[in-house]
Amino acid sequence: MLTKTSTTIQTTSPTTNPTTVPTPGQIAVLEGVEAWSMESTPADCVRFGIFGLHNKYDIVLSGINRGVNMSGDIIYSGTMGAIFEAGNQNHKGIAFSTTPENVAASVKYLDEAFNFIMNNNLFEYSALYNVNIPEEVKGIKITKQGDAYYSDAFHQVDEVTYTQYGEMIADTCPEDKDRDTNAFYNGYISVTPMTKERTDLVAFEKLKNKNI
C-alpha cells in the first residue's frame, strides 16, 4: 500500500481547521522518502495531499499531537482539524494525541489503537476517530466527548500584556465512565467516534416545523 505524507513545518495547535486561501504557503519535498512539508495548517496538509497530489487515500492519519485533545480541546485542535477536513473531502480519518512528555513512549501504542479500530470494523459506524493515549495504558475504550478537565485564567503582566494559563481539574462528570476524559485519566486509550456535522439535530427536529 502506497503511503504519502504531508506535514506542517511548525506546530499549529490550537488552530482547528482553517485553510489558507488562495495559497497554502511554502511546500517542500523531503529527501529519501515520499513526503512533503508545508508552512501551513494541518487542514491545508490534507487539502494538498488530496488536491495537490491528486490522490484518493484509504485513511488520513493526524498526529501524534504533543498534548491531549479531549473535551473542548477538540474545538481548537489543529490535529483534529486535519481529520475534519478529511471528512469534508469524504475520506476516513484518525487523530492521535498524548501528553507532551509521552510522545516518544506512545509510539508503541499506535499500532494497537489502529488495529483496534480496523479489527472491530469501526469505520462501518463512523468515518472519523479521535484517539488519546495516556502514559500508563491498561486497555482501550470507546468513548464520547467529555467535559472540561482544566480551568482557564488570564494573568495580567502589565497594562497591555496578559498571559493565559490553566490548571487540571477533576472531570465534572466522574460517574460517566463513557467520557474520553474519564477513560484517559484512568489509564485507557480513548477512541471517540467523531462527526464533521455541527448541526444540533435534536433541536432541528423540534424546530423544523416552525418555518414561516
Regions found by a protein language model. Give the residues of each.
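Electrostatically charged, flexible surface regions
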Residues: 107-212
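Short glycine-rich anion-binding loops that position phosphate/pyrophosphate groups of nucleotides
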Residues: 41-42, 65-68, 196
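Alpha-helix C-terminal capping segments
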Residues: 49-54, 81-92
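Active-site/ligand-binding-proximal alpha/beta "capping" segment
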Residues: 47-67
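Structural recognition of the beta-strand scaffold that forms the well-ordered cores
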Residues: 60-63, 93-97, 190
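A cross-family phosphate/adenosyl-ligand binding-site feature
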Residues: 2-49, 56
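Charged helix-capping and loop-helix junction motifs
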Residues: 75-81
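Glycine-rich phosphate/pyrophosphate-binding loops
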Residues: 87-107
